[in-house]
Regions:
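Short, surface-exposed amphipathic charged segments that create phosphate/polyanion-binding patches used
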Residues: 12-16
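A short beta-strand-loop structural module common to alpha/beta enzyme folds
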Residues: 1-8
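Alpha-helical cap/lid subdomain in secreted, periplasmic
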Residues: 17-354
Length: 354
């Protein structure tokens, strides 16, 4: 969204915010209904969504200690968002904000984080009342921050800045969100027993098993790729159980003689390990090699698709022309550009699905 967006779908610098917070119940509700209705009608409802995640709170709490007047506007706005979206046929899941990550040893004592925690608790209550989904990013992110600060008071887990995490922090957020939405860990697994070459599989097909020279070779065709991790975010894997919780791309081989073994995919080395580890099973989700390369190529296509939509929305649909340039001809050109960009987004989405 725009920098500074809030759950009532206006930027926090809007001149009427003080009026909104001070308004009596009915007046405040009318203001929220008007603002939310306009925003969703412009940006969301035309897309005919079937499932919508909503994440507000960081800007809403206004970067200060807890204020009941802002909190009331926040919970009312979230409720109104769900009401409008569900009325249009969409399922809704609310996501809490992540904590603010200042470089201090006790981020849980930051009054802004204490406020965000209260906002998150209020959001959970809204979700329960409205029958919506709810995902808590705040607690898992805070738990990792506290753990890292305990060993290094200067640890900074998110990258980016205190409010805008970089790729590592975004990946931790994605982990918390996907877990909260019920994503499961298994991608695929193949377990081979030597010397007979018996095979057990999940999510893949294995054939042409050949046992020779103390090792084994086979063909494996997976139904899906493992969870792609942005190379800029690999630090997140060291501090959160992301692959364990979301991406188990596994290989097991039992019956090997004791010793060290090399795992190769399409002739490319992806792991060196021992017989005991292979017997237990190894997770190859983010090991360098052809599978990770494919997953990252897919992630790159997702980025391209998302960037195309962002450009379409922010740079074209929301672009505000100066008064002298406004008019029917300008809007016709805008509509033509939106049509062209819609086609581009669809084309990129098709590339993702290939």
């Amino acid at each position: 969204g725009w920098g500074g967006d809030t759950s009532w779908l206006r930027q926090r610098a809007h001149p009427d915010e003080a009026k909104l917070f001070a308004a009596e119940d009915e007046a405040q509700q009318r203001m929220i209904e008007d603002s939310v209705g306009k925003g969703l009608s412009r940006d969301v409802l035309p897309l005919k969504p079937t499932f919508v995640t909503i994440k507000f709170g960081m800007n809403d709490h206004s970067y200060q200690k807890f204020r009941p007047d802002i909190f009331k506007a926040y919970t009312r706005s979230q409720s109104q968002l769900q009401k409008v979206l569900s009325g249009a046929g969409a399922r809704v899941s609310f996501l809490t904000p992540q904590p603010i990550e200042e470089k201090r040893a006790d981020p849980d004592q930051d009054v802004r984080n204490q406020s965000l925690r209260k906002f998150s608790d209020g959001l959970k209550q809204v979700a329960q009342e409205r029958g919506a989904g709810f995902v808590d990013q705040f607690d898992p992110y805070m738990a990792i921050m506290m753990k890292e600060r305990a060993s290094d008071p200067k640890a900074f887990i998110g990258g980016g800045d205190a409010v805008h995490p970089g790729p590592a922090g975004q990946t931790i957020m994605a982990w918390a969100v996907l877990k909260g939405l019920g994503a499961t860990a298994p991608v695929s697994s193949a377990s081979i027993t030597l010397p007979a070459g018996g095979v057990e599989t999940h999510g893949c097909k294995v054939g042409k098993v050949a046992v020779s020279g103390g090792g084994v070779s086979f063909d494996r065709l997976d139904e899906s790729l493992p969870f792609p991790v942005d190379e800029r975010a690999e630090a997140a894997l060291k501090i959160a159980p992301i692959l364990e919780d979301l991406s188990r791309y596994e290989l097991g081989v039992s019956g090997l003689a004791a010793g060290t073994y090399e795992v190769l995919i399409d002739g490319e080395s992806v792991l060196k390990t021992d017989a005991e580890a292979l017997k237990k099973g190894v997770n190859l989700s983010n090991n360098a090699g052809p599978i990770t390369k494919q997953a990252r190529e897919l992630l790159g296509e997702v980025f391209k698709k998302n960037n195309s939509f962002f450009h379409r929305w922010r740079d074209v649909q929301l672009y505000s022309f100066p008064g002298w340039a406004q008019g029917a001809e300008t809007e016709a050109r805008r509509s033509a550009e939106l049509k062209k960009l819609d086609e581009e987004v669809v084309a990129r989405a098709i590339e993702v699905l290939k």
